[in-house]
Swiss-Prot record:
Lineage: Eukaryota, Viridiplantae, Streptophyta, Embryophyta, Tracheophyta
Keyword flag Cell membrane: yes
Keywords: ANK repeat, Cell membrane, Membrane, Repeat, Stress response, Transmembrane, Transmembrane helix
Lineage: superkingdom: Eukaryota
Protein name: Ankyrin repeat-containing protein NPR4
Location(s) in or outside the cell: Cell membrane
Gene name in the database record: NPR4
Amino acid sequence: MVSDRSCIGYLRSVIAGSVDTHTGHECTITNHAAEEGGGTAAAAAVKVMTVSGSGKRGRYVRQVTGRHNDTDLHVAARGGDAGALRRALDEAAAAVATGEGREALEEVRRAVAAEPNEAGETPLVAAAERGHLEVVRELLRHLDAEGVAAKNRSGYDALHVAAREGRHAVVQEMLLHNRLLAKTFGPANTSPLISAATRGHTEVVKLLLELDDFGLVEMAKDNGKNSLHFAARQGHVEIVKALLEKDPQLARRNDKKGQTALHMAVKGTNCDVLRALVDADPAIVMLPDKNGNTALHVATRKKRAEIVAVLLRLPDTHVNALTRDHKTAYDIAEALPLCEESSEIKDILSQHGALRSRELNQPRDELRKTVTEIKKDVHTQLEQTRKTNKNVHGIAKELRKLHREGINNATNSVTVVAVLFATVAFAAIFTVPGGNANNGVAVVVQAASFRIFFIFNAIALFTSLAVVVVQITVVRGETKSERKVVEVINKLMWLASVCTTISFIASCYIVLGRHFQWAALLVSLIGGITMAGVLGTMTYYVVKSKRMRKIRKKEKMSRRSGSSSWYDNTELSETELNQVYAL
């Protein structure tokens, strides 16, 4: 019989191997039992790892303990001892890959780190379950994608276990390592989001919901229930709100029994979950399952008096809705065993007009329901029409305001320009081209160009002054009158501009004289073409604008008399598409 001490020494021994010429690396794991009678160490197990390669072959013998034959890496991972785990990996690599390169050492570490116990649990799963972040980080450094995604015999991988246990930091670290881990499935097609939502781990759920491109919120188990079903059933209101914020239509999804999340919520006792679901979609309160049960029927059968009271306060709840068995909620309440909850539920139902199925007058109820629906539809349409009229009135008011502001800006601009024209014209008469004689008379007073300059400069001066007088005299307030005034003063400003141009051309002839006649002609040509082009274009748009207004006025009159033609409508639509306004 071998003593305990010698047996333990044997378990920790390192046995060197012989030279092997095989290429590549092959990993073999063998379990041995060291049973030597009834000693305590005789029940221990040994794991021997052999790695063959281009260098030496080594065998690393490690002690395994516990019910599932955990290795020393499992023990370190469960205890959160990152240092011990690091030393165990280094010892295994040094023992097995003796004399080989760095890649061989890392391959040994990868194989040792991914080694499961008899329950199929890797050290990463053990560390993730207990939330040891440093150990998880250390293991992720050595594991490949297959090792990270390894599942235990229950069908859960490390990320799934961490999400189920609410290890937010571990889940975040593993998602940073590989986002695709969030799409793995456990038993019965359970996703990590479903496990976290069922356990009520809000932070983990919000973290998983950030992965928008994976569609995690749409994933459901084999029975058709998604994460909202389970969160609602367990009464996790914050998770329910987070899921509905992500996808409000999730409230209408049903499982294979036809149950929505509201059916699951009324089986619990949390009224806040019920309110959150109804706020997202009020119509779900009357959605039936495959047996015709609404949320009210389920809550009554589960004897949830408070839930029944909340449901009956909702406007969309039909207290006498029938199941496929032609039973109302009151029929279900009467069939319950006599107790305080069932009596309270019957009282609540009676207060809201609940009846037995045999007491229902189906034609009368159907007619009443139809009339009610028509009234609701009419009320909705009237309300919508009122809102539309209000919006149109607001838009029209805003347009009038903008129109008035545009006219005010135009009048202010015209006033400034008119003052400028008047100033230039007034100053020009005292700085006569060619100068003055000693008696103050202009030297070129007999020239025709001077007479042209003098006359048109005076017209420009008095026209501009007239515009200024009109602008400072007219009282603001009437948009239509202001528009007419602006049209008149704009024409006066056109006249002032033309006169100023002619005055400038005439002064050019005075100053340049006969020696530079070509320069005066060039100035005349430039000024004439510019003013003629601008005024001609503006005249075209003014005429076009007036024509468009006449067409619209004619169309309005024809609509009132009911004699509008297809041709008029076509012409109007074309003018409305090409509106150009000119004052």
